[in-house]
């Protein structure tokens, strides 16, 4: 329940404390769904990133967030962002969200930071488009097809966007079926 839920946060020992880069995933799942994908995969991704980042000295402070009660209405991330002082909020330069990134029948979605598809939700805060482009460049270099997905408010990037913090991230699909175009690109 949200009342008994907690967030778990960790951060790099190195890096500029005035330039914080955050990566997060939610810890909970719904009873009816496959918790291993939603969101064991996002949690594992952020944890592995933290383990790899421990081997380097990043220029920016890196904060890893494992959110409680996302499935109950983004409770953990909302409380975290709401509790930030203005000064602490200004130090967070970007937030990367990883929710359902290991679907067994995936589509490679990148959060659409600049509303480049021109449909659905508007662009994210300034800086979100740059995050989208970084992921697009990576996928292009790897010759992996990708598609934009709207910031529809259904995951923990929501409170950060509302606070004006640039956001980005990856997603491999949820309850929807693939379109015919997606099935051609990714199989299934």
Stretches with model-predicted labels:
Residues 45-49, 53, 77-80:
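Buried hydrophobic packing segments
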Residues 7, 37-39, 97:
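Asparagine-centered polar/low-complexity signal
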Residues 33-44, 71:
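Short, conserved micro-motifs enriched in small and acidic residues
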Residues 1-35, 48-51, 59:
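Soluble metallo-hydrolase cores and metallopeptidase-like ectodomains found primarily
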């Amino acid at each position: 329940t949200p009342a008994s839920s907690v967030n778990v946060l960790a951060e790099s020992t190195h890096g500029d404390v005035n330039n914080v880069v955050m990566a997060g995933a939610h810890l909970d799942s719904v009873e009816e769904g496959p918790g291993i994908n939603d969101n064991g995969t996002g949690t594992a991704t952020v944890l592995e990133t933290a383990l790899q980042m421990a081997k380097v000295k990043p220029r920016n402070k890196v904060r890893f967030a494992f959110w409680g009660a996302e499935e109950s209405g983004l409770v953990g991330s909302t409380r975290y962002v709401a509790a930030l002082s203005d000064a602490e909020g200004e130090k967070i330069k970007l937030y990367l969200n990883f929710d359902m990134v290991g679907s067994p029948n995936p589509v490679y979605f990148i959060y659409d930071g600049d509303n480049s598809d021109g449909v659905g939700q508007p662009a994210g805060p300034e800086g979100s488009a740059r995050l989208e482009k970084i992921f697009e460049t990576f996928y292009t270099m790897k010759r992996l097809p990708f598609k934009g997905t709207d910031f529809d408010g259904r995951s923990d990037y929501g409170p950060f966007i509302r606070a004006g913090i640039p956001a980005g991230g990856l997603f491999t699909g949820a309850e929807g079926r693939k379109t015919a175009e997606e099935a051609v690109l990714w199989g299934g």
